[in-house]
Amino acid sequence: MAYELKSISQSGIPEAISKAELYRYLNEPEETESICHDILAIEPGHQVALRMLGMAITDQFTGSAADRFGEADSVLRRLTDHYEQLYYLGILHERRAKAMLRAGRAPHTLLPLFEEALRCFSQAGEIRPKGNDDAILRWNRCVRILHNNPDLSADKELTSFEAHDSPPA
């Protein structure tokens, strides 16, 4: 027997959003993701559902190649507010870098992700709503991670090459 998805009602969206938020707080990103897909099936441009879906996908990052970075990226690029898009794309790159750091990935693969997160947070900070320092807070967290992990430093990568070094024969 084939089971088919059922559609929620338009009037049920606010309650579905509340449930999706609750499941995120309970660290159940798969449930949040499912609810967001139900909302987006009837209202494809729902901004809160898009934002939560993107974040629910990043909540599942483990630092492996199977992480759904591209999917989260395409979802978050559908955000129409430029500040929100930049801010959440910054979080996307930050979370990917942190997951890869926890997974023990090579430091040289992480620095570009942190740098892209910082670029997004910097641009978001320039256009942030008055009184909203979220992008600054995320910027500072990324900088602290870089300071606390000297292997991630671009300077470290550059100092490993000496002028008298030559390529292997």
What are these regions (language model features)?
Residues 11-38, 103-104:
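Alpha-helical segment of the N-proximal tetratricopeptide repeat
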